[in-house]
Swiss-Prot record:
Biological processes per GO annotation: spermidine biosynthetic process
One GO term describing the cellular component: cytosol
Record's function text: Catalyzes the decarboxylation of S-adenosylmethionine to S-adenosylmethioninamine (dcAdoMet), the propylamine donor required for the synthesis of the polyamines spermine and spermidine from the diamine putrescine.
Site-annotated residues for Cleavage (non-hydrolytic): 120-121
Coiled-coil features, chain-numbered ranges: none
Gene for this chain: speD
Protein name in UniProt: S-adenosylmethionine decarboxylase proenzyme
Keyword terms, alphabetized: Autocatalytic cleavage, Decarboxylase, Lyase, Polyamine biosynthesis, Pyruvate, S-adenosyl-L-methionine, Schiff base, Spermidine biosynthesis, Zymogen
Amino acid sequence: MLGLKEKICLYGFNNLTKTLSFNIYDICYAKTEREKEDYIKYIDEQYNSERLTKILCDVTEMIGAHVLNISKQDYEPQGASVNVLITEEALPVALIDPSCNKGELSYLELRDSVVGHLDKSHLTVHTYPEFHPNNDIISFRVDIDVSTCGKISPLNALDYLIGSFDSDVITIDYRVRGFTRDVDGRKCYIDHDIKSIQDYIDGETLKKYDAMDVNVYQSNIFHTKMMLKDIVLNNYLFNSDPYELSPNDRREIRDRISKEMIEIYGGVNIY
C-alpha cells in the first residue's frame, strides 16, 4: 500500500495538489435523424449549466470546501460548462476578492460576461454530446475535474458523481503533485493511503461494473476505468419500446451497444 502508516505533523500549509479527472459516457441507440436530434435536445436540457452547477456545489460541500465564485455557460447548438472556484477554509467576506460572486447566481445574471478564475482549488465540468449520421449509436460525455490543495480530498465525492449521471463507461484519473514538509523540514509527497481509486467507490456500485486499474505508484498516478456489466435494452432506446422490435433486432442492437462500450472502455477501435 502506498501512503502513510501514521499521521505526520506538517509545517505550515499543506501544499499538495490533488486532482481528480472524472469522465462518464452515456450510450444511446437512436435510429432516425429525428430520434438523434431529440436525444441531443433531451441531453442538453437534462444536463444544462444550472443542473451541473448544483452537482458541483454538492461536490464542494461533500469534500468540505467553500464556494468563492461560479462561472457557467450553455452553448449553442449544444453543450455546457461550469467553473467553480473553491477554498478549503471559509473566508471572511472582507477578504474575498470583489470579482467573486460567492456562488450567488442572481449576481451572475446581472453581468454581461463572466470571467473564470484560475486557482489551485477549483471544479470544472464540460459536456460533449456526440453522434454521426452514419451511426445509430449516440454518446454523451461529461468531463469533470476537481483540483484541491490542502487537506481536502476530491475522492470523497466519487460515489455521488457516478450516481449523478447515466454512467455506462467511466474513466477516472487521480494524481497528487507537489510536496509539503513536516515540522522537521522533511518533504512529504503524499499525505494519505491509497492503492486504488476503487477503494473510494462503494462496493455495491462496483458490483455493477467491470473495472481495471493502471497505476504508477512511484509517480502518485492512479487510473481506474469501469464498464457497466448488464445492458438493459430499455435503458438505451430513446423513445422506443424494445418489445416492438423483433428478437433478432434486439440482439443486434444490444450487440452494437456492447461493442461501442467495449471500444470506449479500451480506448481503441476494435470492430
